[in-house]
Design a protein with these regions (language model features):
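Polybasic, glycine- and aromatic-enriched phosphate-binding surface used to engage nucleic acids
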Residues: 298-485, 489-499
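Hydrophobic pocket-lining residues within nucleotide cofactor-binding pockets
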Residues: 90, 122-124, 349
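Class I S-adenosyl-L-methionine
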Residues: 1-81, 86-104, 126, 150, ...
Length: 501
């Protein structure tokens, strides 16, 4: 090549983006890949040692990712002399630009390049093949490499795409993980796909079907994490937790996953690199994917995952607070009376204890709706939402019923979670205090931050996290009761002494 074709395609893409209003682009789920991100993605492939390769770019847009991978082959892989490129793109407005860009690449490239642009729906057009119906094609095309930045928007539960891929869907799916599933299906055995996508799929029950499919038929080999949510997409003011993953289509589990990280897509020359055992990155029955960025974080996972019992196995469960206050304003009260119960908010959680009342507006509510009240018994409260800049994600407070003997019932606002027993018995004070030490520790706070990059504490995820045995929890609790020290430093020290000594 006389010069970088990716520069040419990226420049023309920038002009196209700036000519369109953002709401139009967002409605199509199009967030165009930056040039540096595309080049980094292309570098991740282990290029097959053969003369002819088949490449798929689903949701090709203007062809930035296609340009990046072709440029990589043209410059650094002389053993490859022929490329068969297939692009899917349904946006009629950008199809002419895609065709022009690919034609330019074909004229400039050293390699022989055959191009097929399909303007059909990537998911619907292959639904029979994916599901293995009687209408499936007997000769399904498979690819050596797939490179993708899929569209990003939610589909309705009854959308045809969702109905056609029930194996990976749960509820109203996001189109991006249908694209990723179909791309894995399109790969030849031992083929590789490199995708940029939100990191939300790595945890949460909503994505369990997708994770099960992806991690059964494919295996993660590389993950790249962006520390900043900015500067990933070109000329787009997009704020979302984003990652790049490389998946090989194989049933063989690799020993390690290479995890890299950078501040943004403009500094790939300054990345951190870590090789983490596969069973540390992909762990548990839910197959959560833990995105560690340091040896310290890898050790955190090993220490916590050494336990085998999540809370439900001990008869405990974290639940979400019962009352959405702004939707039930007619039930809220400022004063206590015979038919009112205390309504606990996150503001009542102070330094590990529950302080009530604090003179806050609407601290009480009517008890007329049974579904919004709960028995006054011992609980551990955990904030459901924290600010991004806050030092801790897990923020807990011990609620002891004997401190509020005047109430038979209480209520919890929807922005806090609480840990309770499954059989509606009462936790002992020692058990509640032991749970506090565990969840208030630095170890478990780091663990949850690795598991979930968001600021929300998800009860389903918390119920899957392994914790110490009940007898150890009660020993920890007795230590806390004796000391009266609710600090994180004390929790860290006692957890180490009692559980890890």
């Amino acid at each position: 090549m006389d010069f970088d074709v990716l520069d040419y395609v990226a420049e023309r893409t920038s002009k196209y983006i700036l000519s369109k209003p953002k709401d139009m682009r967002k409605s199509l789920g199009q967030f165009f890949t930056s040039k540096t991100t595309a080049r980094f993605m292309a570098c991740l492939f282990s290029f097959p040692q053969k003369k002819r390769v088949e490449i798929l770019d689903p949701g090709a847009g203007s062809g930035v990712l296609s340009a990046a991978i072709i440029e990589m082959i043209d410059k650094y892989h002389p053993e490859i002399s022929q490329i068969a490129l297939t692009c899917y793109e349904t946006n009629s407005d950008i199809l002419p630009l895609l065709a022009e860009n690919l034609d330019y690449i074909k004229r400039k490239a050293r390699v022989g390049l055959s191009i097929e642009i399909l303007d059909t729906d990537y998911i619907i057009s292959q639904a029979d093949d994916f599901s293995g119906t009687i209408s499936a094609s007997p000769m399904q095309r498979k690819f050596d490499m797939v490179i993708g930045n899929p569209p990003y928007f939610k589909l309705a539960k009854d959308a045809p795409e969702a109905a056609l891929m029930p194996e990976v869907c749960y509820g109203a799916p996001n189109i991006y993980f249908l694209f990723a599933s179909m791309s894995l299906f399109n790969l030849a055995d031992n083929g590789e796909m490199v995708y940029i996508l939100p990191r939300s799929w790595t945890s949460v029950a909503y994505f369990s079907c997708f994770r099960s499919y992806l991690l059964h038929y494919g295996k993660l080999t590389d993950v790249h994490i962006f520390v900043s949510r900015k500067k990933v997409f070109d000329n787009e003011n997009v704020l979302q937790e984003t990652m790049i993953m490389k998946v090989r289509k194989t049933l063989v589990v690799p020993q390690t996953v290479r995890i890299t990280s950078s501040v943004s897509s403009t500094d790939f020359n300054e990345i951190t690199e870590l090789f983490v055992p596969y069973d540390v990155v992909v762990s548990g029955n839910e197959q959560y994917v833990y995105l560690v960025t340091s040896e310290e974080e890898a050790n955190v996972l090993k220490k916590v995952n050494a336990f085998t019992n999540p809370m439900p196995s001990m008869g405990l469960k974290m639940k979400t607070g019962l009352t959405v206050d702004f939707r039930n304003k007619e039930l809220l009260r400022n004063n206590c009376s015979d038919n009112n119960v205390p309504l606990f908010y996150s503001q009542h959680m102070k330094n590990g204890r529950v302080i009530f009342p604090i003179g806050k507006e609407n601290e009480y509510m009517s008890d007329e709706l049974p579904g919004m009240v709960q028995v006054n018994r011992n609980y551990l409260f955990v904030k459901r939402f924290t600010a991004k800049e806050e030092r801790r994600r897990l923020q807990c407070a011990i609620y002891l019923a004997n401190q509020y003997p005047m109430f038979k019932k209480i209520s919890t606002q929807n922005k806090i979670n609480f840990i309770d027993t499954i059989d509606n018995s009462e936790m002992t004070e020692e058990l509640v205090c032991g749970l506090y030490i565990v969840l208030n520790s630095t170890l478990y706070d780091m663990y949850y931050r690795i598991l979930n990059g968001s600021t929300q504490v998800n009860s389903t995820e918390m119920n899957s996290i392994p914790i110490p045995a009940r007898r150890d929890l009660e020993r920890l609790g007795r230590k806390l009761i004796e000391s009266g020290d609710y600090s994180t430093e004390y929790c860290d020290r006692v957890l180490e002494e009692v559980v890890y000594a």
